[in-house]
């Protein structure tokens, strides 16, 4: 029986296996994938299809869209491929980063939680946005970051959707809240004044 995998758009068409089953977000294929009242949604969010059909969708001709210039920040080159299957935990893989105390605190709390949900949306948002702004991988073209976060969030369907939206679908990766808000509003900064800059992404 073929295995089922949540499709990571950052992985590219070359990673597809024709015999495998993939769960895709139909929002990624607007104008290409036709849905009907009879379409079956897995976990209420995804459509299942074979790798062969997904390959055809990905290689279908799409209308060209104008590209706007984006200012890219420098990032730390870290490969997180081993985190995608749990061979190495995310905290260990990120040990080379000088993460601010707020992100260390959030990562620890999310890692120790039995589930990534339950009043932790703000923590997930800040942590995902932080990594999206400071980490990249030239080898995997950052696909490993997506897979590592999906594993870190235990493949929870809602969390999968959040990661895909924040790191792939959004035109620009959102920045985490500034340090003042992290301390005064979100209550996620354990000790003010220990970081440089006005945003957690200034520290990595």
UniProtKB/Swiss-Prot annotation:
<keyword id="KW-0805">Transcription regulation</keyword>
<keyword id="KW-0804">Transcription</keyword>
<comment type="function">
    <text>Required for late and very late gene expression. Specifically required for expression from the vp39 and polh promoters.</text>
</comment>
<dbReference type="Pfam" id="PF03041">
    <property type="entry name" value="Baculo_LEF-2"/>
</dbReference>
<keyword id="KW-0426">Late protein</keyword>
<dbReference type="InterPro" id="IPR004283">
    <property type="entry name" value="Lef-2"/>
</dbReference>
<protein>
    <recommendedName>
        <fullName>Late expression factor 2</fullName>
    </recommendedName>
</protein>
<dbReference type="GO" id="GO:0019079">
    <property type="term" value="P:viral genome replication"/>
</dbReference>
<dbReference type="GO" id="GO:0019083">
    <property type="term" value="P:viral transcription"/>
</dbReference>
<comment type="similarity">
    <text>Belongs to the baculoviridae LEF-2 family.</text>
</comment>
